[in-house]
């Protein structure tokens, strides 16, 4: 004769088998390709970090080991009125043989009604079970999002680690529960917390080849250069696991490809030793694209200076062509100045030094007019060539040396015109070269003035762009928070409709 079995008791273990349920089917020791031994180096890669913390997330429960309140929290068999009576006693935070409270059991099994009653009675939130896990960690580990949200809303700390160093965020990332991970971050979860293997949530996602979570954490500004206990970056872990898609994703973030682990190996070294040809090609292409930037950063300053000096005449020539219309529309004083220079050259064909002194003196005196043209002290009509005070200088040979020193000191005081030099042998140069230097001097000052105005405008534009970007970031953050709240409300409505 077959013994009768209570249908209620028989259904419970079948409904939620320990360690496995419909949505928890991925909790097994072969959840990663590297655990299944695909690839030459993958098995060793996963053995670097213990996977036991993530296996069998649900509690093993025997009915005879639980008290009345713990049974009600786990199975939810007790009517609400009786449960309220139980919660009036002093044993609301009582633990069973494995240090589990009623809150642990209710969260692990998704009994949100019991969790709500326990929270209303102000039960302790930060009690640890035998594996130093809080009720929040159990709720996240078992993917009971509604219970986890209630705990967070009542002030549960999301950064308390278990005996493996994993926080609630580590388990959300392992479960690929993007909504739960986003909720934890909104409630202050540390995105850079490390477990005992030195894995941050991002490194854990890379190690598990969870590309969706890797993208999410990169978007949340996770540190791409974080190191595990072996000094390995996210890129090295992705290479060791043979995930070309994650390697490509990380390379798009301009990650350091030359970082070495404690064994002195780089990502490329592991790719070569594991014969991952696709990854080798990705790394090679990335380094080739980065090479121009590195070579320009390590170039010789003397060579750069030489190239600049060689390119200066071409730059000035191009500037002269591009600004031809502007130069032709200058005020009449510029035309007078050019006419005066030509006439002076004809009158004083034998005195090079005097003309050079007048030109430089006039250029130095032009600071008040933006540095474009020399200033004149007196002008009676257009055909007047130079002021009387300047013409008299040509009849005073004993003052030439003093005037030369004055001109040199004025030239050296112009900080932005270092490219224009006046040699001491200028007295022996011909008038054509001197006149060419004068035109170059005038064009360069005009170019510098225009560059200064462009820089001011550019600065204003950049400030406006930065302000808009900051405003956009604030709007995106607010939108994400509203999205999470809407999804949570939809989940709660769905639960209430059942």
Curated annotation (Swiss-Prot):
* Signal peptide (UniProt feature, chain positions): none
Per the UniProt record, one Pfam family is: Ank_2
Which UniProt keyword terms apply here? ANK repeat, Coiled coil, Repeat
Q: Where is this region: Disordered?
A: 289-410
**Which positions are tagged coiled coil?**
469-497
**Repeat (ANK) residue spans along the chain:** 98-127, 131-160, 164-193, 197-226, 230-259
UniProt cross-references to PROSITE patterns, sorted A to Z: ANK_REP_REGION, ANK_REPEAT
SUPFAM superfamilies from the UniProt entry: Ankyrin repeat
Q: Where is the composition biased (Polar residues)?
A: 290-302, 348-359
Family the entry assigns: Belongs to the POTE family.
Q: What is this protein called?
A: POTE ankyrin domain family member A
